[in-house]
């Protein structure tokens, strides 16, 4: 938030409180259909279209409109689209940095249905961060107090503004990706690199719209189209790549390791293949269990990394440690659940959370009967 605020301070901004209301209102409206549409990239695109439509109304037309409707149209007309698009670009650059440094730690192993109906392993990378921003805006912007202060430098989006003030802008950034073809670290790097390119292109489009006003609408549409292009690119890339987390002829594929387990202490990582355990070649999960039972106090492993290079690991085993060393294997046909790939609206996610909470709570009637029965037995 601090870094993004500093960048926006250097650029300047003509975002008014009314524009903030429009962005959040449109984002919440779109989230009713799909949660990922809550991203401000879509709200900025819609705002650009609405502003273009509202700009048709001149002063005489506004006078003939009802007061409330006239205020709405005026708030759309006063939205400074280059500043809005620059804000969206900077937020995606901040998202890129967060994914680059924290994306791998947010990865969670999952089982999903593959292209041919076979269950395969994968990773869900998902993270959300609240980002409080302080925007440098004209001091006369809407509900802001008059006065303000002058700047020692000419901001990019502040031509003709003499006095400035601060505007608090609460924002939320996040991402969600699924991969069955790449290691979590590589997927996070690919996602962050594409977001960096998106932010740079959108920032350049915002700067162009500042000096060529008619470019504001194409730049707003570009905000949506490029964002959808990134989503489509990721899905096509996954669809065209073979699944990585499946068992092969050489051994058992490691999907992940449990933190604090013997597997983590040994240095086992996702994407490695277990070839031999205690000298026994393993092809199915039962082979691994039998090989571990041969020597409950010590284990010797032979693993192949993603390049096919063989690595040898060994370690003493102690009572109470995970029976499978804490290794999460890629799924076989005997799985009890899979993660369904589906895009839900915000209300769907809220309902899922509430339904899960209600399932964990005991029914009132039964809990009351149990309590009365316990009291009767005690007496």
What do these predicted regions represent?
Residues 19-27, 44, 84-91, 166-170, ...:
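Hydrophobic core segments of alpha-helical transmembrane domains in multi-pass membrane proteins
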